[in-house]
Amino acid sequence: MKILLIGEYSNVHWTLAEGLRQLGHEVTVVSNGDFWKAYPRDIDVSRPAGRLGGLQLLARIYTLLPRLRGYDVVQFINPIFFELKAERLFPIFRYLRRHNKHVVLGAFGMDWYWVDTCTHKKPLRYSDFNLGDQLRTDDCAILEQRDWLGTSKERLNKLMATDADVIVTGLYEYDVCYRPVFPSKTHFIPFPIKMPAVSNTGRCRASKVVVFIGISRGRSQYKGTDIMLRAAKDLQHQYAHRMKLVVAEGLPFSEYQQQMEDSDAILDQLYSYTPSMNPLLAMSKGIICIGGGEPENYEILNENELRPIINVQPSYESVYQELEQLILHPERIPELKRQSIEYVRRHHDYLKVARQYEGLYLSLQ
């Protein structure tokens, strides 16, 4: 098949492309590399800096459009698939829809269904937008609500979801937002991870537990990494002889990986039920995820044996307690590392995931 993957989130599309190519398909990835993370892509559509950046990008995309025709499948990472206002994306989507056979919409991150469901229906005990029945009031959550609810982004998302042949959800959280609305065409497929040639199940340092945390620019409070970082710093102060903390902020993907490499554990998103791409990549290397590991995460994967993730509730106290237990009981680390590697191999190996996508795409032909 000839497959076009548009947009990027945390290397999902590039990793999927690598798997699909291994299966013999012709794949083109068009993206901006997920901004400063600079993930690989075949065709770069980064927005130039400056006041005229939007117009320059729009001109480049219109020049590219004739090359983006005649594909068997076009998959969009998100309704905002280029760095343009939603109003500009309506005609581009319609063009790509008209000149290609089938359209797949990815439910992999921020969009109207995610914002609206978590704000109004609240099916999750906690999320980026709610803690129980209470709405979160931090600046990022409010900004996203204003950005998506009752706007052209909402209209674009609804159009693309309704018009798409299928919708693929990458995490449990997104599945519960789309499946009730589109039960017949929503398909859950786990995120793809390329397993490293060598994974480490031993301790990185015999004397100290090495804990890694990555900080996203401007999204620390929204993702809960501010709380996790505070707990980790307090524990480092208390257990300086037992723990080393590594903090990475705003790094390109290649540098992020290097800094993460020699860690025993990674602190990830506080308000998540599930591990996303960065913690899954860490787990594939034998790094323990401290973050989202709720029962629903294992249920959607039909995983009844492995429990590698140290699940935390969205509070300072929970993070502090769980991380402290790992520091005080480092004998747990080798088994959790082993389970982490097996978990990713079992559910997220990029070739296994690519075969699931291949089966879905073939069912559309």
Where are these regions (language model features)?
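Acceptor-binding helix/loop patch of EC 2.4 sugar-transfer enzymes
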Residues: Y39-D42, S46, L105-G150, G218, ...
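Acidic donor-binding loop of glycosyltransferase active sites
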Residues: E261-T274, I287
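A short, active-site helix/loop in glycosyltransferases that binds the activated sugar's phosphate group
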Residues: W114-V115, Q145-T186, R230, Y357
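Short hydrophobic beta-strand element within catalytic cores of glycosyltransferases
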Residues: I288-P295
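Conserved donor-binding/catalytic core segment of Leloir-type glycosyltransferases
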Residues: K185-K223, L229
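Membrane-proximal helix-turn-helix segments that form the acceptor-binding/catalytic region
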Residues: L65-R69, I92-R98, H102, D128-V166
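A charged, aromatic-enriched C-terminal amphipathic alpha-helix characteristic of glycosyltransferases
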Residues: E331-L362
